């Protein structure tokens, strides 16, 4: 069974983008390539349990096991040594990617306090969109009682679009609530 958001992309977004940007082929229409969730846990240097808890929460949110990221350089000011585990990340592709994006747009973002839409300035110039979330409690999989500390995360939506304008049209078509 195809995902609801993927069907919307194929049936509504592709024809709309083809008409708007005059693509010669359906294959030229931009699509979401992958979504990367990154949770940096700075206090994991002093307490490794914090990193385990963050990785568990990321696994619940994404539906797959996160990769533990390690420090590339030693930074004395942060008491950081090269090779120490300091975060977790997940790369979503295919069905899980569409399921996560659908859940993010329809369930999680509306649960953010004082939400007026996601910022429009977070495109990187190459058609990718980055979004910061201040707390993991907006996701329905996270039980409020089990949370020891609120942690934020970065969500990067990588698209095949060449420009920010094309990428924004794609994400708007998929239901991303941009701020006016």
From Swiss-Prot:
Say which domain of life the source belongs to. Answer: Bacteria
Might you report a single GO cellular component term? ribosome
| Residue ranges crossing the lipid bilayer per the database entry | none
Q: Name one GO biological process term.
A: translation
Q: Which UniProt keywords apply?
A: Ribonucleoprotein, Ribosomal protein, RNA-binding, rRNA-binding, tRNA-binding
Molecular function per GO: rRNA binding; structural constituent of ribosome; tRNA binding
Under the heading Pfam families, the entry gives: Ribosomal_L5, Ribosomal_L5_C
This chain's function reads: This is one of the proteins that bind and probably mediate the attachment of the 5S RNA into the large ribosomal subunit, where it forms part of the central protuberance. In the 70S ribosome it contacts protein S13 of the 30S subunit (bridge B1b), connecting the 2 subunits; this bridge is implicated in subunit movement. Contacts the P site tRNA; the 5S rRNA and some of its associated proteins might help stabilize positioning of ribosome-bound tRNAs.
Quaternary structure annotation from Swiss-Prot or TrEMBL: Part of the 50S ribosomal subunit; part of the 5S rRNA/L5/L18/L25 subcomplex. Contacts the 5S rRNA and the P site tRNA. Forms a bridge to the 30S subunit in the 70S ribosome.
Q: Which family does it belong to?
A: Belongs to the universal ribosomal protein uL5 family.
Name listed for the protein in its UniProt record: Large ribosomal subunit protein uL5
Organism of this sequence: Streptococcus suis (strain 05ZYH33)
